Amino acid sequence: MMPEHSALALEGRKILVTRPIRQSNGLVDLIEQQGGEAIVFPVIEITAIDVKQWGEWNPQQTNWLVFVSRNAVEQFLKGNPQPFPGHVKLVAAGEGTAQALRENGLTVDLQPELSNGSEGLLQLPEWQQMTQQQVVIVR
């Protein structure tokens, strides 16, 4: 006799959700929709670094600001409310990051089309012959 298979992929399973508490709701909902039990146990808290602790960063000398995540966008903007100089190009590592920039009224100048993440960024032609440019990576 063959065992019956549940229509819900996660039925009877417990899933540990380690995302920050304010970011876990969507994942918890998806787990529960598939019959799983979500155990919320945030292991990190994401906080902004005070702009005074950034050291010698000078926006006027920056050519590229590279954001690697939605959290990077949110925390950077909390700590740096001033507008960016017009010459600074904003780079998003993926679609979620780009969306976070747009939600804050910013224009994404560069984003990998096919591959999300730093690997996709490094494959872009703009990064192949870069010289005399200051790149700030926000993570």
Language model segments and positions:
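Signature of uroporphyrinogen-III synthase
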Residues: 2-139
